[in-house]
Amino acid sequence: MKNVFLPLFSFFYILINCFAEENIVKSTISAMSPEEKAAQVLMMGIEGKKIFPSYLGDYFGPYAPGAFILFGYNFSDTPQASAAYIKSVKQSIQKLSKAEKFIPPFFASDFEGGRVYRIRKIASYLPAPKYVAENLSEDDALALYTHTAEQIALLGIHLNLAPIVEKGKTMGIGFLGDRLFSHDKDIILKYSKIFIEGMKNGGIISAVKHFPGNVNTDPHLSKSVIDVDEETFYKEFVDLFKEIIYDSDGVVLISHVEVPFIEKTPFCFSKKGIENILRDKLKFRGLIITDDMAMKALKEGGRSTSDNVISAISAGCDMVMCSEPRFRELITIISNKMKTDNSFEKRIDEAVFNILKMKMKMGIIDESCMPIEKNKFNEKKFYSAKEAAEKILKKNTN
């Protein structure tokens, strides 16, 4: 009899804890001002590489962005200095915050490998995805990504904006090149899963991108369109992502590509694409973030960054990435719309809920939504992980 009731008791215990945790998150959100909620849905770029620039105090003011995206210029020449910079940003934002309950930002960057690897000067080398898939065994690839993630995490970073889960021959995606694992679906799936598992082992969350895919037009430069029928769209684009994100609670980064048969608008603005396909058909329960709102693919027709941010959130994106210095402007635009549009306010609450749940998963806040103080940079652990990664690379180049 004991064996029958123990699993049942465990199930109800977990269920009760989940409900309690969700209620705490919801009560935390209800206590936030519209401006604080608006700040949470923004992933902003930031200047500096050594300490938090004092002149940014007035720019950020009393509000803490939900996240920061770091570029190559944000990393110093040593891991110690880079970790100190990230710590300085977090501490400075906390001092500036006037929130009753401070919610720390998470830090994200691109660590795909090869030409897209922001810490190449201070960490072990990470080859391009194509090289890894062609030259490393599954075990070596997993170990390499694990040890790379350990270094990334020790710097104070939480989210890797990778891997790219796309096929190179689909619509001739030439501009991505060796950033793709392969042209073969099975190899892409195998090494994408290895990448995500390795990052997780090392303490890093992965954002699979760029859902639902790309064509041979770089959205940084101009409008991009997937002009195919529904059957081809699912077979050549969505099915790859489905294998990775079905019933998942991770992170998905949305492309700016347009899919006309769904809606003649960038996918990040398409409620039919995000809600009907990603949420409903693929059962994705995690965090949805956009690519950079500053890309030229979104600027056509005279649209402003503010317009784009509102459109992306309204469509179902939880967090918008913006490398332009528009933090205060965007907070004002978002919070003003919340005050006059009940459905938009509800959408923001849903987005902030997903963000806070992800921050719990990242270990940034606890079940009570209180900040968790992480350990300081550990030089010994960093160089140990760096050495372990370099040994794997050396073995595979001899």
Regions found by a protein language model. Give the residues of each.
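Hydrophobic faces of well-ordered beta-strands that scaffold small-molecule active sites
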Residues: A39-I46, G66-L70, P105-F111, L159-P163, ...
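N-terminal hydrophobic targeting/anchoring segments and the immediately downstream early-domain regions
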Residues: F19-K121, A389, L393-N398
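Active-site mouth loops of central-metabolism enzymes
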Residues: V41-I51, K130-L142, S222-K235, K296-G302
